[in-house]
Amino acid sequence: METIAALTRTENMRNLLLGISALVIVGFSSSSGFALDPMGPPTAGLEQGQFRAGVDYSYSKMDLELTDGTYVEYLDGILFDSGEATSFALKDFKASKAYVNLGYGFADNCEGFLRVGGTKGEFDDSIWVDSEQFDSGNDLAVGGGLKATFFEEGDLKLGVLVQGSWAEHQGQLDSPNWTGPDFVDIDMVEVQMAAGASYTWEGIISVYGGPFFHFVSGDLEDTVGASVTGLGELLNSEYDWEIEEDSTFGGYIGAQLEVAEGCSFNVEYQFTAAANAFGASILWRF
């Protein structure tokens, strides 16, 4: 009877987690906010020599500081003017990412992983404040990281992780008030470092989370569409800013479900003062 009751509790917890995950996915998919990467448990989950493959997805938005800006103007192809561009905050940069995740257990308490996938970004009315909109195409994103467990007692694990990624967003910035679009190229490098805990029930369901550090660096280039002066001359302008995130510290919480032998699904929420994100993964160990 105790075994049946335990199995019933486990099945109920499994159904509850799946239901919560579905609600979270629907909620984020219908919200206005969309570029943090999913982290998963901050502890190693592979044995030595074991492999893992799967899919990661994240949907996030953040505020970015554009600083140390410069501009160059050309008149009929000849240098006309140059100088410093105004620094400002680019609000609600939205990005969705999808990765193929490949992992390997270097030891029972240490694993590494690589990610390759695509990303899509957008923002509204932030550079020129003239009802402009930016929408990138589907661009390349790559990343990788390490996880290590440094304490394990029963179902409780403590560990650390570090991961990084690079993504590019290229597309047009356009406004109904302009005669033609600008062309924007964004390169971003993100680093996340976390320390936290993972606790497992019945060997099937676990919760995890902890504090993390988030660092963003990169640059944004805006090539302004050519315009013709009153004298019939062609004016081209190029702007360039360095990118930083407003906030660097935050926290995250998630849950992981063993949906089948060797297959797990996890869902998580990350937040800082300037960013928030939803992440989900489905992974197979072999």
What are these regions (language model features)?
Residues 27-75:
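Outer-membrane beta-barrel biogenesis signature
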Residues 109-112, 153-158, 204-207, 257-267:
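Repeated loop/turn-to-beta-strand initiation elements of outer-membrane beta-barrel proteins
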Residues 64-72, 122-131, 170-180, 219-228, ...:
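Outer-membrane beta-barrel translocator domains and adjoining extracellular loop/strand segments
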